[in-house]
């Protein structure tokens, strides 16, 4: 979010160009390919990170990068686009004309309106993270819900498949509820009723 805000404020600058390239690459690269490249570079060639299994913090670095790279790119692009649009609105120009500091204009007035669509995208992307975890868990040999679901499907254990899908649906429903509650904190005009 921070990179998107800065890129939106400094439209056309080096930071903006970097954020747009990052967003383009992040949305284009498949997490499976990224995970294989990270294993090849940091696990096999440089031998600085473990390639599979679970243990300490260092075992989580590559899977976290793989799962968060696309998520971060989408969020950065959405924030930047929203910030550029909001900063061109008339009320932002009027707020600046009143002599309010730039930082207050960005944080209090512009960011509040940018965050609503960003929170929506983040909520839907968290569901996508759950769905994509099966592939990442398989690549890094992590014993997680995603890999358990794949194993249950392959062994035709229907009760386990139904249970895992029910848990996943419940988690996604809770995430959507939290997104709706978060809306009321961002914009008090929105009510939960």
Language-model-detected regions and their locations in the chain:
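Extracellular/periplasmic helix-loop junction at the C-terminal end of a transmembrane helix
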Residues: 31-55
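Cytoplasmic-entry segments and transmembrane alpha-helices of multi-pass inner-membrane transporters
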Residues: 2-38
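Alpha-helical transmembrane segments of integral membrane proteins
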Residues: 1-15, 44, 54-193
């Amino acid at each position: 979010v921070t990179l998107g805000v800065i890129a939106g404020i400094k439209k056309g600058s080096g930071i903006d160009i970097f954020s747009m390239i990052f967003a383009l690459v992040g949305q284009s690269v498949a997490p499976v390919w990224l995970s294989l490249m990270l294993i090849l570079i940091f696990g096999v060639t440089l031998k600085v990170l473990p390639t599979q299994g679970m243990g300490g913090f260092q075992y989580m670095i590559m899977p976290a990068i793989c799962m968060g790279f696309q998520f971060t790119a989408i969020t950065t692009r959405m924030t930047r686009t929203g910030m550029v649009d909001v900063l061109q609105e008339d009320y932002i120009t009027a707020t600046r004309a009143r002599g309010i500091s730039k930082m207050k204009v960005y944080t209090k007035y512009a960011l509040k309106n940018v965050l609503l669509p960003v929170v929506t995208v983040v909520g839907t992307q968290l569901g996508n993270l759950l769905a994509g975890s099966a592939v990442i868990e398989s690549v890094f040999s992590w014993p997680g819900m995603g890999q358990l679901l794949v194993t249950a499907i392959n062994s035709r254990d229907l009760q386990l498949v139904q249970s895992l899908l029910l848990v996943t649906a419940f988690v996604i429903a809770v995430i959507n509820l939290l997104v709706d509650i978060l809306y009321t904190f961002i914009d008090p005009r929105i009510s939960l009723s």
